[in-house]
Curated annotation (Swiss-Prot):
GO cellular component: cytoplasm
Its biological purpose: Single strand-specific metallo-endoribonuclease involved in late-stage 70S ribosome quality control and in maturation of the 3' terminus of the 16S rRNA.
Binding-site residues, Zn(2+): 137, 141, 147
Annotated protein name in UniProt: Endoribonuclease YbeY
GO molecular function terms listed in the Swiss-Prot or TrEMBL record: metalloendopeptidase activity; RNA endonuclease activity; zinc ion binding
Principal subcellular localization: cytoplasm
Compartments reported by the entry: Cytoplasm
Origin species: Dehalococcoides mccartyi (strain ATCC BAA-2266 / KCTC 15142 / 195) (Dehalococcoides ethenogenes (strain 195))
Protein origin, superkingdom: Bacteria
NCBIfam families tied to this protein: rRNA maturation RNase YbeY (TIGR00043)
Amino acid sequence: MPPFRAVILFRHMEINVIVKPPFKKLVSTPFLKKIASKTLKAQAADPNSELGIVITGQEEIKDLNLKYRGLDEPTDVLSFYMLEENPENLTAADDFPTPPDENIHLGEVIISYPQAELQATAASHSVSHEIAFLLIHGVLHLLGYDHHEVVAEAVMKSHQDIAMKHIREILE
């Protein structure tokens, strides 16, 4: 009888990126994937996590903001999480195993490039820096962080600051 062999499947986080045509030459897909990946890993997200990133314009994000938040104005970033339950404690230590061929789709982060550009100018830093910040912010929302209350806002800001330090070399 042949010896028993264990097969270990190593998965990686799947990050899907769509950059709308007017912004394709302005934003690097590998840059976005690195930022998202480092943020997810720093938060100990499940290695089977999957997320989508969309870079779009003012009109599309304004339409989404109106449809889903009731605000008839553009915004910088929107996060749409896809999990049925609040993803607050979604980490690699979760008791429920995910089959090796299934990813946990956290959701979508949608960023307005023109809004990021405006905010970068106002803050006197690069558009890449602003996009990284907005992406981190969006990913943290998908992981259950929020900023509607003072304490929660402080916690989220702390995680954003830590993530920005982790990606500093990517921005240079």
